[in-house]
């Protein structure tokens, strides 16, 4: 119903925002990361929104960027994951880290979110792994990797390097770690996992 709402930020706390637009105040539930990034009360803001409608509940959820909204929509598509759990995930980890956790079966990262136990984390990975493709991961990271335009091997290497960079490693560290473990028969998940093991060694 609403793609986004642009207006004046009237109020914010750890759970929701109130944005006034054309004389109407919208209560928008959101993540801690959006609360931190949205700006000061009184300023103009743009919030990407999702209207959640159930028989006993109509609520508006929103985020400061499209990437958070995309992950929110993916999460609530998972059986047993509602909006509150999705908000909890987005409050704990960034969209790029979420995407990386899913494609690398990183249950530990997902369970950092309050209310997300091991079983739910496993279900998230199972149901979303095929939906989070290489292009989406690289887009979330914000690094150009020429996925889909380069050869298959170059694509896997570029994507693995990009994934390590989002975890805080420098381009040089990421490139060295990937080069040390890469073989042609590896898929992207195996490359990343093996590279991380190498980086973890003293």
Predicted regions: what is each one?
Residues 1-73, 77, 190-198, 202:
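Structure-specific DNA junction-binding interface
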Residues 10, 50, 76, 91-94, ...:
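Signal for well-folded cores of large energy- and translation-related assemblies
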Residues 51, 58-59, 83-102, 123-128:
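Amphipathic, charged-and-aliphatic alpha-helical interface segments
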Residues 72-76, 87, 107-111, 161-165, ...:
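Amphipathic alpha-helical segments within well-ordered protein domains
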Residues 86, 98, 121, 174-177, ...:
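Small-residue helix-packing motif on alpha-helices
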Residues 111-114, 124:
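Glycine- and Gly-Pro-enriched alpha-helical subdomains that act as flexible
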Residues 129-179:
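Strongly charged, low-complexity linkers/loops
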């Amino acid at each position: 119903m609403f793609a986004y709402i642009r207006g004046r930020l009237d109020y914010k706390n750890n759970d929701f925002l109130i944005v006034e637009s054309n004389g109407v105040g919208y209560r928008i539930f959101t993540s801690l990361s959006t609360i931190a990034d949205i700006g000061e009360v009184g300023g103009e803001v743009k919030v990407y929104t999702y209207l959640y409608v159930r028989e006993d509940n109509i609520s508006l959820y929103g985020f400061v960027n499209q990437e958070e909204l995309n992950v929110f929509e993916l999460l609530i598509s998972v059986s047993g994951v509602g909006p509150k759990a999705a908000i909890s995930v987005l409050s704990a980890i960034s969209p790029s880290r979420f995407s990386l956790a899913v494609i690398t079966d990183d249950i530990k990262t997902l369970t950092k979110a309050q209310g997300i136990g091991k079983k739910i984390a496993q279900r998230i990975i199972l149901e979303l792994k095929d939906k989070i493709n290489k292009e989406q991961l690289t887009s979330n990271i914000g690094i150009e990797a020429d996925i889909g335009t380069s050869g298959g091997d170059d694509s896997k290497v570029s994507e693995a390097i990009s994934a390590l960079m989002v975890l805080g490693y420098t381009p040089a560290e990421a490139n060295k770690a990937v080069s040390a473990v890469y073989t042609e028969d590896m898929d992207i998940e195996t490359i990343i996992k093996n590279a991380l093991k190498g980086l973890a060694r003293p």
